[in-house]
Amino acid sequence: MEPWGEPEEDISSGLWALPGLVDGHAHLAQGGVEIRPGDLDGAAALAKMALGAGVGLILDKGWRDLTVVHLIDKVPAAARPEIEAAGVVLTVESGFWEGFGRNVAPGDIGNMAAVAAGEGAGWIKLIGDWPRKGVGPVANFAEEELKEAVAAAREQEARVAVHTMAREVPSMAVRAGVDSIEHGLFLTDDDVEMLGARGGCWVPTVLQMEATIKQLGERSSGGRLLLEGVENVKARLATAVEAGVHVLTGTDLAIGTHQVASEAIRLWELGMAAPAVIEAVSWSGFRATGRPVGFDVGSPANAVLFSEDPVSNPRVLADPAAVIRMGRIVS
């Protein structure tokens, strides 16, 4: 199956180009909130749909199986975005959805992290905290355990992402040296300074947080906590960018990866400056993962083109004029 068409003329005249959009927190294994084993064919279709929407890089943050890792091998690179992926997520007993992910026994985090790093495609994912009935989100791992996981991942050149919605866990994870904070509702100024100093990532997934608030109800204890967290996110966005953090757009399960532009637009609506929004949905993801960016001779022939300057109007991100992958136009 050939998904490409050769350009008959120069389509770039009068258009604005980015190297591609980035989804920094995706779950391609399933197309929604159904917590089931992954669907390889469905994941391939979602990846193709994302490419058609201008997505050039996906950081998949894990599932209950290795569907997305297998996808990377199954689908030729020219027919999908670049993909890095965690494999099976790591948690503890009662620390995530029942039966989802691998439970880490006390004292075994280093071994489990090493296994996860070997199975994944560049990442491991830890569920840093999870709500317990009547208590709210509780830390699943001690800070020393997080440090062990980071050390084990480093030995295999893998990065570590940590899910966190609790108050204390973002600071623990940052001090432990993790590479990416997922959600991170309660990051502090000290956290973003430390994270930025090492070029770490933060993927706030605002649309997912707002969807969860709606599901829980704004007056519930969980809803109130997340509302407070989203307000903290708004207050930290500019500080994080200034500190050098790679703030990235991420869809999670709220929307599809092909809709990642909606997350960028939401960040803009929440007060993030337009240039920073464009960085978050494009350039920063490539830089954070060590990929070349730019359009100099010899650079990768990948681009998403827009009829308006996205810095002047971020809403145009949702309506690309053309997408180029490896020198060919996506049809």
Over which residues does each language-model region extend?
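Histidine-rich, glycine-flanked metal-binding segment
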Residues: 1-19
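Metal-associated gating/positioning segment near the N- to mid-region
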Residues: 15-77, 94-99
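Acidic/histidine-rich helix-loop elements
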Residues: 28-40, 93-104, 133-139, 214, ...
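Short, acidic/polar
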Residues: 39-49, 101-117, 165-169
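Divalent metal-dependent hydrolysis catalytic cores, especially in the metallo-beta-lactamase
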Residues: 43-69, 80-91, 119-134, 159, ...
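Active-site gating/metal-coordination segments in enzymes
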Residues: 94-147
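Active-site core of metal-dependent hydrolases
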Residues: 133-234, 242-248, 253-255
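His/Asp/Glu-enriched, well-ordered alpha-helical/loop segment
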Residues: 155, 230-309
